[in-house]
Amino acid sequence: MTVVTPVAVAQPNGSDILVGSGQPLLLIGGPCSLESEQLGREVAETVSKICKKLGISYVFKASFDKANRTSISSYRGPGLKKGLASLARIREDLQVPVISDIHDISQVGPAAEVLDIIQIPAFLCRQTDLLVAAAKSGKPVNVKKGQFVSPWDMENAIGKLRDAGSDKVMLVERGACFGYNNLVVDMRSLPVMRSFNCPVIYDATHSVQLPGGAGGSSSGQREFIEPLSKAAIAAGIDGLFMEIHPDPDKALCDGPNSIALDQVEELLTKLVKVRAAVEE
């Protein structure tokens, strides 16, 4: 298995999380969109405790703006200013690192003041100016592989970031288009992208999404979260990305492919066992 140089992610307490070969599994998890600060706190606090118990590193994720929703009427989030303020309070009060996605260059500066990791959405993974601006922020950059991009083509995205001065790059596999309104996961992409000396994270929830499959919104098949996550762990990933909600059926964004908060501990416990078996 390829040895990947760990990426350091700052924590509120001043220490670093290390993501890569020989390091604890990373979980990036939280609601798709920051529906409310209270909901975000509930998820962050609960998942943080679970991860500490299981020896998993944790970064809380929630979007302040979902700029790529299927319909104009879809809920997008609290917006840049309010959303970042909520994320800053969650970070400080719960002492958990935070990540969110940016959609244009103007958001990089404000986001970098709050976020511990800047995320590039899948649809924007080839946007050179956005990647360069994110790299120059000095923060670790988590790039989601577009559903339309091959794993080997992501070496170009890494090249843009590294050329702009960043050596803190992580990649996320979130499935590939399989005809219309469907995604599949090619597990070969995980070792391919790790071969670029870059930690690779598997998006366990977006990978089971059915994009636009519900007409005015996306649908999903959350029953496949567990088996595909086990396969990704066995393939040697460095981390997992999960959208987590207390009541996915009532979520304002990506509910059909989110995992329920009360199911997280059971799933992570199984995945830790799979990782331990693979590492023996």
UniProtKB/Swiss-Prot annotation:
Pathway: Carbohydrate biosynthesis; 3-deoxy-D-manno-octulosonate biosynthesis; 3-deoxy-D-manno-octulosonate from D-ribulose 5-phosphate: step 2/3; Bacterial outer membrane biogenesis; lipopolysaccharide biosynthesis. InterPro entries: Aldolase_TIM, DAHP1/KDSA, KDO8P_synthase. It is found in: Cytoplasm. One of its GO terms (molecular function) is 3-deoxy-8-phosphooctulonate synthase activity. It is an enzyme of class 2 (transferase). It catalyses: D-arabinose 5-phosphate + phosphoenolpyruvate + H2O = 3-deoxy-alpha-D-manno-2-octulosonate-8-phosphate + phosphate. GO terms for biological process: keto-3-deoxy-D-manno-octulosonic acid biosynthetic process. Keywords: Cytoplasm, Lipopolysaccharide biosynthesis, Transferase. Its EC number is 2.5.1.55. One of its GO terms (cellular component) is cytoplasm. Belongs to the KdsA family. This is 2-dehydro-3-deoxyphosphooctonate aldolase.
